[in-house]
Amino acid sequence: MEGPNSMEVGSLEVKKNDKDPWSKTAYLGGRLVSKIPAVYSNDNKFVFLTYDTFIGIFSLITGDCINRIFFPNNLANLLPVAVLLSPENAFELYVIFQSGYVCVHDWSNSELLRTMEISTRVHAASFSGKLLFAVTDTPASDSASSQDRFTLYALSPSTSKEGSSILIPTFVSKFNEFLALDSSLRDNNLATVAVITTDKAIFSLNVPKKKRSQRWIHREHLFNMPQKLTNVSLCGSACAVSDDEGKIHVINDISNEKFNPQILHWHANPLNGLSWALNGEYLLSGGQEGVLVLWQMETSHRQFLPRLGSSILSIATSHDSDSYALHLGDNSLVVIRAVDLAEQIHVSGINSFESKYLTSTGPKNTSKQLQGLVQFSSVSPNGELLLMSSSSFNGHSVSVQEYDLTKDSTIRKFEAARYSYSSVSKNSDDATSLDNGHVGSVAVTSSRNGLYIATIDTWCTNIIDEQQRNVKQTALKFWQFDSVQKTWVLMTRIDNPHGNLEVVTALKMMTSSNRFITVGTDATLRIWALLPGSSAWKCVAIHHFANTHSQASIKQRYGFSKALTCSLDDSIIGFGYGSCMHFINSETLEEISTVDLPHGGQLENAQFLNAEHCVIISQRRLLVWNVISASVQWTLASKFTGLLASSSSGNDFAVIDFNSSYSRLIIFSPDSPKIQSIHIFKTLPVALHYLHGGFVVLDNKSIIHVYAGDLTTKIPSAQLSIDNTSRSLLGDFQKRNVPLLNLENPISGSQGLHYKRLTTDMIHNLFNVPSNSPVNMQAIYNTFSKMAVGEPMESLGTQIATLNTE
């Protein structure tokens, strides 16, 4: 064993190349679908899905993405709040952003036709006839004399004297609270708008008047109940309002001065989706139960479409009511035919992992966020597919999906674990509110020949037991691919494979054979193999590496690690325990060597690169171990997440480190600590793999980042910019408050440059060194001249400074 004195801590030094061999490719895989409901084209042949930076246009015949509409790239933080088809031109698509920008595109060719700007924040928008209704913040001058924080405007299209398109605003109403907006046309082609707050619905009806083109009458209905309203949907004069108890309040004619709502109640949880069909003859509803309910309004008869696989977030109905587009909680869209309630198309991206471990929006608590996940993703043996676990129904069901990065879609999915979700908690956004159990984490890996998959699911019967007594149940499952049914079939289930209440901390397939390895908190390493001539899997070898009976405290059990690896020929198995990495012979299970990483924290990951090198990562240290000479090749200190991947040749490997502001993908060679390539993330990386000849990073927003390799997006990623000729104001709408853009020097990226004074304290924080360490500011001035704290790191290219404390 090599002692700590033989370790030399390397500094972050960038290898100077003319070209970065691991540059980011133009790949648009993954991403989360926005909460904005899907939009049908007028001919009902296409559906529009909104993502973070673009709108995807999908064919309702093939389910393929045929085109993308990108948001302008010279404006930062564009958050869309509404995507609407023009009532006058079937090819014009309006995109309204929260910042007040309105972009009009020709969706047939993705051309940006014109842009307009509202000078205040927009919360919601909806078309009714030729009028565009928008809920905005009340202008500062008006809000000073009123407590109403929101204003509803009716915007009518027009043309200015200069010939540019504008929208002329008309004030409709003000209100202090706002939850949802919808609009519709009554039988006489007059507009109706419905706005709901937490306890009342506000209806604005457009009525004709001789001397004025528009006049509005307002009606309010107060719901005298403790439940809060959640959603609203209009169809002509009929209105449906839902509350957080799952009730639907139906008002048949809001034009009447007095009305008594009809109550429809089946859902036990708040409703997310409401939509009318067949001109008000049917009402569709859906929520956390994952069941679509179709209400026949005349008879109140109900029809159910269950087993959708995830909660329903929104519902959209085609213009001819022949199909329904359901946005599901697992980040997918399913279109259902109305005639037989069968699936027409299914657009499935990266299924989200509804877990308390992936809620962080930054890398500050990365290790804590990922601590509960054993290994939720892996790569198929042929290096083509990404295997991932995903949860739904607030952690009550966990599935394994096979994701094809070339098609950017899920090609296969099966349920790996389920805890009864017959009664989903109403406080579904709060994981600690679950008192009836949930699946905590799932590990997944596949055999070398790709015919078998092993999964580990860990679940608890009561959240209080998990938090106070750390009581968990574990199941090891082996699955075989059914070539006829094209799905995975359960072969063997082993409950508590490491003993009662013992948790499996690591799962790994052996490199060259169809065997699996597990490590558990009973301080044993177990090898599992398929019995000859049988469909049953069994433990064939056990290695005891510690005496857990003398370790009574839970604190000492944190020495168990997720680090587990095999050599390329399966002759050596490496596993982590405490601060040490142990290497044993896979046949005799005798110990070969031990590597100690002092002051590095808990071991997070390890991987053999080739026959000579093995990379070991702890929370605060990276070490390259030479297996042949049993010595340290090199090591360096930083804060690491534990994510690790190596190229197929073993000549390069990638890790993720982090600080309080960002994460970095750093690519090394096993021979030297010099950085081959470095890339910055403002999001939280949750998975790192090597596929299709490049390193693939999946972040907590389900965005896939690809570095090198042959993966490219099928759709051209041409970006749009707002220029001076296409920009106009919405008439005189709050013109005095319009923030003008500096069009002489447009922002070239999604972020502007923000410079700050570089201080010694900032350097200490940047490199994670003690605050009393001396820093020679003059000596490092030149290398730090481009690295002001707060500057977007991607602008540095491959230039990175090294801390000099001489």
Curated annotation (Swiss-Prot):
WD repeats lie at residues 266-305, 448-489, 499-538, 598-635. It comes from the Eukaryota. This is U3 small nucleolar RNA-associated protein 17. One of its GO terms (molecular function) is RNA binding. Involved in nucleolar processing of pre-18S ribosomal RNA. Required for optimal pre-ribosomal RNA transcription by RNA polymerase I together with a subset of U3 proteins required for transcription (t-UTPs). One of its GO terms (biological process) is maturation of SSU-rRNA. Pfam families: Beta-prop_WDR75_1st, Beta-prop_WDR75_2nd. The lineage of its organism: Eukaryota, Fungi, Dikarya, Ascomycota, Taphrinomycotina. SUPFAM superfamilies: Quinoprotein alcohol dehydrogenase-like, WD40 repeat-like. Keywords: Nucleus, Repeat, Ribonucleoprotein, Ribosome biogenesis, rRNA processing, Transcription, WD repeat. It comes from Schizosaccharomyces pombe (strain 972 / ATCC 24843). PANTHER family: WD REPEAT-CONTAINING PROTEIN 75. GO terms for cellular component: nucleolus; small-subunit processome; t-UTP complex. The gene is utp17. Component of the ribosomal small subunit (SSU) processome. It is found in: Nucleus, Nucleolus.
